[in-house]
Amino acid sequence: MDIMKDKIRQALSELDILATEVQIDQWLDYLKLLEKWNKVYNMTAIKNIDEMLVKHLFDSLAVAKYIKGDSTVDVGTGGGLPGVVLAILYPQHQFTLVDSVGKKIMFLKNVKKSLSLNNINPLNTRIENLEGNFDNIISRAFSSVDTFYELCKHFLTEHNQMLAMKGRDLEERNLESLPLNIEKYSIKVPFLNAERNLIVIRKKL
């Protein structure tokens, strides 16, 4: 476990993120819960905690600096990625975690109770049925960027942003004709030799 903690500290340093030992312990406790539940409920295709450390934890932390304001909705959150990871980092920030699969929300309610994460609100619903105002609308491996925008555009205002975490295939062909400001950032994930991108969508003022 000390080796994993050292790896987390190194990743935090590379990402220029300040975190406490308590937060590091919370991230590890979360990954242990994810690994445990995954054996029964198939929460994620990644089975072992060492791989989860890089492909889930560090991948989620790599977008932390792009989170603005006080509230975020995590669309198709699955096992809580990136929402739970970011909620541990930003305890004053409210995260609404949305997924249509009941077992995943059941898991996240267990995470909330086990880790005393009072700033997450897991909801078993479809994103198109959700109402509310959020500073960030984020998704990770949820769908194409086009589909993400179509399902979530009712949240987008002049004052917030949508963030799509993607791999190599960006698939945002249909957005270019819309009155949107679209920015693409190349994301470096510590210990991961793979292309990662972040698409940030805002309304044109």
UniProtKB/Swiss-Prot annotation:
Q: Which residues bind S-adenosyl-L-methionine?
A: 76, 81, 127-128, 140
As given in the record, the signal peptide range reads none
Catalytic activity, as annotated: guanosine(527) in 16S rRNA + S-adenosyl-L-methionine = N(7)-methylguanosine(527) in 16S rRNA + S-adenosyl-L-homocysteine
Keyword field contains Cytoplasm:
yes
Identify the EC number(s). 2.1.1.170
- Keywords associated with the record: Cytoplasm, Methyltransferase, rRNA processing, S-adenosyl-L-methionine, Transferase
**Where is the protein situated, by its record's location annotation?**
Cytoplasm
GO terms for CC? Answer: cytosol
One Gene Ontology molecular-function label: rRNA (guanine-N7-)-methyltransferase activity
Function per UniProt: Specifically methylates the N7 position of guanine in position 527 of 16S rRNA.
The entry sums up its family as follows: Belongs to the methyltransferase superfamily. RNA methyltransferase RsmG family.
What name is this protein filed under?
Ribosomal RNA small subunit methyltransferase G
- Per the UniProt entry, what species is this protein from, by scientific name? Francisella tularensis subsp. tularensis (strain SCHU S4 / Schu 4)
Q: What gene is this protein translated from? A: rsmG
